[in-house]
Regions:
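Extended alpha-helical targeting/anchoring segments
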Residues: 1-451
Length: 451
């Protein structure tokens, strides 16, 4: 039962940024950040780099490289990931104050879902980033904001890893700047046509809810890490992340947990229902109350709660699925969100990867029924979603998992920055309001990068 050696470093609240900055241009350097959020899920920042092994999935193929051997496989990517975890000699016991004890950490793009469900291929695959990019790490730096403690854990010598961290230096990079205006992949008129097509499907009983998105794109130069730091400070999202890939980067400012697994206990917190924040405290409080009591938003939320109960029920202990919180309003800097919580137990015979596969991609960003909604998304959205609406997170050696839904997430690739926003459309949705909601969700992010 190999457990990591742990050393404690002097406290500084910006430790994650401080230690990550010199690594931020290194492929496979990844940071899960709690976004300085005033939020119950803001406790930990997790930093990793220099993985023992890597897994990259593109379409039907996964490239696995463990430093000694490299091979390509058409097997289920999450099965390959589980095999890599099982091959490592590390079996630490879960630790309340250290959520990640080494293991798998990375990106599970929306289109990884094509490996688990049969979907059409209408939408253009125009961003050549992987569907899955996950490293297996035998060390991590964990910043605990609650206990004000910084732990460096390693299955090797943590002092040596600390020296390595301190020896890293950043290559000089140009300051970040947009070099063009943001442009959508659809006009207002095209959005309206797609909205009406969704309505036709809804009224024919084909589905109950479809998440329809538009994608914004701009050219940029310079350092994506600098852009992330600016956005992270301003947006304070509890499931933020910066992922440096071999070609490109993911900048995530997500408010949404996908699935957490802690010592066999499952929790998922789907967001469905959004209204913009208002400047006046009194009006803002009324806005929150309006969202809490909105029959349309509650109906949308309930559909996704039912879908997630069903997805998790595929692998959970029979009879263990519960809904302890329904329709709770959570405020974020730009918007109020309506959130529900679903819990269950995972049988000891199954792994975190089985749970992830059963529920992937998250129902809150597809619609219901899920597979039909995904087919409609592929038909109506011009391009594949790629990293957006997938998941970022970890599967720890100790069996724990925590993942986000990658909404409010930017993809940087070949000098282009992409940012999508959508909303769940139901039978009584109003076209102008749905169109405006896509802007409410990302306007703040888009404008911050223009300045």
């Amino acid at each position: 039962m190999l457990s990591p050696a742990i050393i404690t470093l002097p406290w500084r609240p910006d430790a994650a940024e401080h230690y990550f900055a010199p690594l931020s241009a290194l492929p496979w350097a990844m940071l899960l950040h709690s976004g300085f959020a005033d939020h119950p899920h803001n406790r930990f920042d997790i930093l990793v780099a220099a993985p023992r092994a890597t897994l990259l999935t593109r379409g039907e193929q996964t490239w696995v490289d463990d430093g000694e051997t490299a091979f390509v496989s058409a097997e289920d990517p999450l099965q390959l990931l589980q095999q890599q975890l099982d091959r490592q000699p590390f079996t630490p016991q879960p630790h309340d104050d250290l959520p990640f004890l080494g293991g798998a950490l990375g990106l599970f793009g929306y289109d990884l879902g094509r490996r688990f469900e049969r979907l059409p291929a209408h939408a253009q695959a125009d961003i050549a980033l992987p569907d899955m990019a996950v490293g297996i790490y035998d060390w991590a730096l964990i910043v605990d904001h609650q206990r004000q403690q910084i732990s460096l854990l390693s299955y090797d010598d943590p002092q040596q890893r600390l020296q390595w961290l301190q020896a890293q230096s950043r290559p000089a990079m140009k300051p970040f700047a947009l070099t063009s205006a943001w442009q959508s992949n659809m006009s207002r008129q095209q959005y309206g046509e797609k909205f009406r097509q969704v309505q036709a499907y809804l009224h024919s009983g084909d589905c109950y809810q479809v998440n329809l998105a538009q994608r914004f794109q701009a050219r940029y130069v310079g350092d994506e890490w600098q852009a992330f730091r600016q956005l992270n400070t301003a947006n304070r999202a509890p499931f933020s992340a910066f992922i440096r890939l071999e070609e490109g980067a993911i900048l995530s400012l997500s408010p949404e947990r996908f699935i957490q697994l802690r010592q066999g206990e499952i929790q998922t917190r789907p967001i469905k229902g959004t209204l913009p924040r208002l400047d006046s405290p009194q009006e803002d409080a009324r806005q929150a109350e309006k969202l809490a009591n909105s029959p349309k938003d509650r109906a949308e939320n309930l559909m996704i709660v039912d879908l997630m109960r069903n997805d998790i029920g595929r692998v959970a202990v029979p009879g263990s699925v519960r809904v302890p919180e329904l329709f709770v309003v959570e405020p974020f800097p730009a918007v109020h969100h309506l959130v529900s919580t679903i819990t269950a137990r995972l049988p000891a015979t199954l792994h975190a990867s089985d749970l992830l596969r059963a529920a992937f991609p998250g129902g809150s960003i597809t619609g219901a029924p899920k597979v039909r909604a995904m087919e409609i998304i592929d038909e109506l959205e011009p391009q594949r979603r790629n990293a957006w609406c997938g998941s970022i997170g970890y599967l720890s050696y100790c069996g724990n998992m925590d993942t986000s839904i990658t909404i409010r997430t930017l993809t940087a690739w070949q000098g282009q920055l992409y940012c999508s926003a959508g909303g769940g459309i139901v039978a009584d949705s109003e076209e102008n309001a749905e169109y405006q909601e896509t802007f409410d969700k990302v306007n703040r992010i888009l404008h911050q990068l223009e300045n």
